[in-house]
């Protein structure tokens, strides 16, 4: 059987305004801890849109919309997904915990849970923290989080681009 790609009209896309006004809460927010690349932040927005993430927190040196480089990758997702810039990620973690979120550092730690072993609690709200391209999640932020989640990997690098990690993690916890 020959297959074909769907046409845009068949995808049932709605306008950004319609989506903003009707989107259900997913119970998941992203926290970007000092991610320096506008391309990675733009990709995070686009992936957050695809998975229905409630909000993206941009910590420290993260590029913040409006940014032409960020927009080039986000393709307008930064206009649909709510965001907030914060200077202190540790304070944000504590605020999110006080608001009832389970805050999870996506990082390789001594006690990290493998993504394939993670079981999402149906009514729980999660804040997923992703770190800088070189240093990862700051140790002080890891210390403040409730736990850590690790993407099992093979090979020699034992790391993924942060934008890839975001997509893998959001798919894994769905």
Question: Model-derived features: where do they sit?
Answer:
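Post-transcriptional modification and biogenesis factors for structured RNAs
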Residues: 1-174
